[in-house]
Amino acid sequence: MKTKAVGRLLLLALALAGFACGAQNVKITPLGSHAGELCDRDRATIFEDPTGVRILYDAGHTVTGGDDARLGTIHVVLLSHAHGDHIGDRKLKALEGGTCAAPETVSATPNSTTGEIAAAKNAVIMMIAPMAAFIGKKVENIRSKPTGACAQTGPDMVVPFPAACLAAVQLGGARTFKIANATRAVEIATVTAAHDSTVPRELLSEPERKNLDADGVSLTLGPSSGYVIQFTNGLKIYLSGDTGIHAEMKTIVSEFHKANLAMLNLGPNAVTGLSAAYAVNELIKPVAVIVSHVNEGATTDGKAKPNSRTAAFINLVKGRPVYLALSGKTMEFDGNAKCVAGC
């Protein structure tokens, strides 16, 4: 009897140890147009810290709006730049609509998917200051009340907030966020992205559109940015945003922030597969890579199509795993950027 009791206790201890280990993982869940695939318009990604802080990055076109059931709780909304496929001037008509290469979308004007989600989730709006002000105005239009700065009484912003609020930053700035009962906070820092940040005309007021049309110019909402998020388990993920390669991938992202996981945007307008692979292999040097923003229907049954640009990039990356940002598939990473589940 004593032997059986000891055995049961040992099994319980092992189970609890496994649970504790799992509880220390960061969960990363892409939200795309077609479940289990990496598709043309896919941008949105949710990050969940072990303490429960949940962050949405670049809502874009592949959510159905603030009521998308896949979102769950969102504490912080990040936006890399104001292009329509990131700020979300359109949204999914329905999940699985259209094809992976050409998802079916409808207009998200006048407020954008980013604005809709921030308002619906009472989220912190953390992004470059001109974009934060712009999204804050969209939230004001939805809620019929001004969007103020987030209250902060200590070194960290404590989430959730009772209403959407602004945590505007400049390039290079950072904020920290924690759940009320947590002992550690998640740090989010902005980093350089070599890209423009023009906002879609459809999201502007009629007078503003007319002013711009007179000279054939566009409105830019400050510089683009990427982010480095340091989670409480030690994982440091670099979110590239749309960018060409640049020296700060080495000096700031790798050497200063010491990012060990990279989520890299592809897309021929900003970066080629060859240059993106060079950035990974020679500049950022992460332990692992997640590939997103591929501007093609990159997969079939969750596998990269052999003749896709995405597959070509993966084949050029050396010495580290590359994971596809498959919609609805949650990946879990430990503090050393090892994928321990879902990859």
Please place each PLM-identified region on the residue numbering.
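A cross-family glycoside hydrolase active-site/sugar-binding cleft signature
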Residues: 58, 240, 264-267, 291-293, ...
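Active-site environment of divalent metal-dependent phosphoester hydrolases
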Residues: 36-41, 63-64, 83-88, 127, ...
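Bacterial N-terminal signal peptides
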Residues: 8-18
